[in-house]
Structures are given as C-alpha cells and as structure tokens.
Curated annotation (Swiss-Prot):
Keyword Iron-sulfur: no
Cofactor note: Binds 3 Mg(2+) ions per subunit.
Name by which UniProt lists this protein: Lysine--tRNA ligase
Source organism per UniProt: Legionella pneumophila (strain Lens)
Compartments where found: Cytoplasm
UniProtKB keywords: Aminoacyl-tRNA synthetase, ATP-binding, Cytoplasm, Ligase, Magnesium, Metal-binding, Nucleotide-binding, Protein biosynthesis
SUPFAM superfamilies noted in UniProt: Class II aaRS and biotin synthetases, Nucleic acid-binding proteins
EC numbers: 6.1.1.6
Gene giving rise to this polypeptide: lysS
Binding of Mg(2+) 2, residues: E415
Length: 496
C-alpha cells in the first residue's frame, strides 16, 4: 500500500510501517552500516549543474550519495525520487530493468526512509541533474510519516517539541541553525585573532554571582552542599585575569530561573570576555569592529532586514547616556525632572508605571528608560552611564560617582550586549556586595550574594580591566530574521 495516495492518520501509517519493518527483518534487513557516502548533493549540483548534457554523459561521473527519501514518482518500470542530505536534495532515477529486485522492494519503501545510492550522473530532458542508479540500498526504515510536503510542520509548538521533524521538513529551520553555527565560529575566529584565550569555567557554583538574576538550585550529594547553575561566568573569568590571563573569553550557557518569552529562555548562550588594560570605551570600539566582522563573515552584508526594517551596521553606532536617551525619545520631559526622586516618581506615575518606594533615583531612571525607550532603539545604539545602584560590579565614573563606566548595546529594541570597566577596588566591591545582601534580605530575589573568595582574589590585584557579555541567541534572531528566541534554540524550554 502506498500511503502517499491514501488518506491515513498517523497511527494507521505507523502500524503499516511497523508491518513493513517486520517483513524486512524476516528477509534479513538489520539496519546496515556498511554503505559509505562519498558525495553531498549540494556539491554535485554546484559542480555539474552548468555542464552540458552530452558532455556530462561523456565524463561518466560515478557518485555515491545517501539521504532521506523526500519525494518520489513511481511510473511503472521506472521511478524518480529525491533524497535529502545535510546539504540539499538531488534526484535519482531507478529502472526496473537495471535493478529488478531492488525496484520491487523500492515500491514498498516510504517517504522518510534513508537510502544509499551509487550511480552515474546524467541530465534529464528538462536539464535536471540526476543519478542513474546502479546500486540502491535501504539503510534505515522510517516508521513515522513526514509532515505534509506542501505545508511542512506548521504548528509552532510542535516545531519546538519535535525539532528533529522540523529540521527534516523545513529548509528555513535548517538554514537558521547553520547560520547560528557559522556565527559562533566567526565569534571564535575574531576573538582568537585578537589574542583572546578561550577558557572554560564552572557551570555549578557554590555562590551564584556575576549578574542580577534568580538562579536554579541543585544539591551535590557527595559534598552535601547546595549548588547553583551559573547565571554568569563573570567572577570566575575575572579571577583568571587576576591570575595573569589578560585576555580571556568563554562561549557557553547561562541559566536564569526567570520568565519565558519571545526574548527570554531560562537556558541561553553567551559570549563573555575580559581584557586587561582596557576600559568600556575600548570595548564599544571593539564591539563595532566585531559586528562588522560578523556581518561580513556570516551574511556578506552590513545591512540586515529584520521584521520589515533595515538594520544598518555601516553607520557609526549611536552613543547616548541613559538620560540623553530618555530626553531624546521624550522631548516633553525636562532634564531637571530626571535629577530628583520626586521628579522621576511623578513621571512614572503619569505613565502608570510601577516602582518600589525603596527604589533610588538611578533605579527609577532605569524603569523609565526600559519601559518607554528601550523598544525604540532599532539601529545599533550604545547606552551609557548606568546608575551605580544597579551596577554592583562596574567601576564608578571618575566624573560622577552616581553612575558607572558601563554600556548596554541595543539593536531592534532589545539588549544584545552589556559591558563595563570592571570594579577592581576590593574594598568598594565588598561594600557593594554588602548592599546587595541588604537588598536580598529585604526581599530582592535577584540581588547578589557576598562572595568572599572573589573579594580575596581582588585583594591580590585585578589590573584595570573591561568586560562584556553578548547574547548569542538574540543575535542569531537578528541574523535570521526570527521573531522568537525559540526559533533559534534547537531545543527550547517548554511546558510539559
């Protein structure tokens, strides 16, 4: 029975294919692993698509390919079928006269089955590059049907839960994750070329730190101690700078026990790096160079279309302080209103934006910025002068101790990177940790713990240093024009 021409539900197809597999086992089929592929579909198409039909026949090009059957047309004593490998698709021509036994078996194979094919290249009368099969071998029997070839896997939730099916059915999904891989490779190339050392730091921490976030908690049975999945590698990377590794980076996962949205996944990938004898201005310049390199290397263009608008990486990236950004996008607000707690509270009340009575001036300014300005920063923009009270690891500004030498980098209305000149004064850092502990005791679940070992490391001396973290998932969203972070994570977190 050919299921392509009969409307069957998935359970019926599964039952029929199980029967086919049982019959195959009886005849000796055991999922063989002796076939060796020598060619990829895309490479063959690139090499021979422009070759004239007659010239190709004279060359007698022998090939060996393997992949999944994704399309087939059975026509009496001859059939065409397409196989799909990691690179693309190629057509195969199979004749009963050439391989009578295999042809009879082929008629009972199904879409989704994985086969190995050896044969000679030729072109059909319509000019399509095709393999004239001389050997065809079933390698894997597929028991479940592929999604409808015209509609693919349309259910978004199902795409995320069954990514393996999504990758089979949707070329766009495969392209997204290829771009992701190329992007991470380009990150590494740029960092290595700039003399940064790639390192690995712990994923389980005895004390959570490095960011303001709620951690995932676990327990180490042998040591009988509470451990935390890391929310950031920052404090360990800076320990390495203390130890003498002056340029370090890490690409790895962070975990934050927070909400899930189109921009947030509890498990996400970051590039984090630290450079001794540099400040946050150096890192902003470095970031511009990095993004130029990524655009050139991965997309071969510095203008990217995202959700119907063009992001231009060619122009110098705009730089605004938090206050300047608020005033730019709220021309009705007066600068002096941002200088007092009462003025900021009035602005937030007028906009019906919530805040805590204990929030200081800097926190109130940030609420106003995040809720009303951030989403408008579409072109690449650095926002600087973040308040000290929300930047416990950043160095204070020499000209205004109420703000820090810190920036956040925004594209398409979302934060892509966060960087600052590092606080290397052990006594100042200890005092800020103490204030964080007070906030935690007052109910702030995201406030930091006091990390005495990190303070001790600073007491040995951290050179003037700047550090930055870049969210790779969000950047992949931009580079692939994806609306949701789930579209760029192979196996995103979902409700059970």
């Amino acid at each position: 029975m050919s299921e392509e021409h009969v409307h069957l539900d998935e359970s019926e197809v599964y039952h029929i294919r199980k029967q086919k597999l049982a019959e195959l086992r009886t005849s000796g089929f055991n999922f063989p692993n002796t076939f060796r592929r020598e060619h990829l579909a895309d490479a063959l198409l690139k090499q021979y698509s422009e070759t004239e039909k007659q010239t190709l026949e004279q060359k007698h090009v022998k090939v060996s390919v393997a992949g999944r059957i994704v399309l087939r047309r059975i026509m009496g004593k001859a059939s065409f079928f397409h196989i799909q490998d990691v690179s693309g698709r190629i057509q195969v021509y199979l004749r009963s006269n050439d391989l009578p036994d295999v042809y009879e078996q082929f008629k009972h194979w199904d879409l989704g089955d994985i086969v190995g094919v050896q044969g000679e290249l030729f072109k059909t009368n319509t000019g399509e590059l095709t393999i004239n099969a001389e050997h065809v071998e079933l390698l894997t029997k597929s028991l479940r049907p592929l999604p409808d070839k015209f509609h693919g896997l349309a259910d978004q939730e199902l795409k995320y839960r069954k990514r393996y099916v999504d990758l089979i059915a949707n070329e766009d999904s495969r392209k997204t994750f290829l771009i992701r891989s190329h992007l991470i490779k380009a990150f590494r190339e740029f960092m290595d070329d700039n003399h940064f050392l790639e390192v690995e730091t712990p994923m389980m921490h005895p004390i959570p730190g490095g960011a303001l976030a709620r951690p995932f908690v676990t327990h180490h049975n042998t040591l009988d101690m509470t451990m935390y999945l890391r929310i950031a590698p920052e404090l360990y990377l800076k320990r390495l700078v203390v130890g003498g590794f002056e340029r370090v980076y890490e690409i790895n996962r962070n975990f934050r026990n927070e909400g899930i949205s189109t921009r947030h996944n509890p498990e996400f990938t970051m590039l984090e790096f630290y450079q001794a004898y540099a400040d946050y201005n150096d890192l902003m310049n470095f970031t511009e160079q990095l993004f130029h390199y990524l655009c050139d290397k991965v997309l071969a263009t510095r203008q990217i279309e995202y959700q119907g608008q063009v992001i231009d990486f060619n122009k110098p990236f705009e730089r605004l302080s938090v206050k300047e950004a608020i005033l730019k996008y709220h021309p009705d607000i007066k600068a002096q209103q941002l200088e007092t707690v009462e003025g900021c509270r009035t602005l937030l009340n007028d906009l019906d934006l919530p805040y805590k009575e204990t929030d200081g001036l800097g926190k109130l300014q940030i609420i106003l910025f995040e809720e009303t300005v951030e989403h408008q920063l579409f072109q690449p923009t650095f926002i600087t002068e973040y308040p000290t009270e929300i930047s416990p690891l950043a160095r204070r500004s020499d000209t205004n101790p109420e703000v820090t030498d810190r920036f956040e980098f925004f594209i398409a209305g979302r934060e892509i990177a966060n960087g600052f000149s590092e606080l290397n004064d052990a006594e100042d850092q200890a005092e800020r940790f103490r204030k964080q502990v007070e906030e935690k005791d007052a109910g702030d679940l995201e406030a930091m713990h006091f990390d005495s070992d990190y303070i001790e490391a600073l007491e040995y001396g951290l050179p003037p240093t700047a550090g930055e973290g870049i969210g790779i998932d969000r950047l992949v969203m931009l580079f692939t024009n994806s609306q949701s972070i789930r579209d760029v994570i192979l196996f995103p977190h979902l409700r059970q």
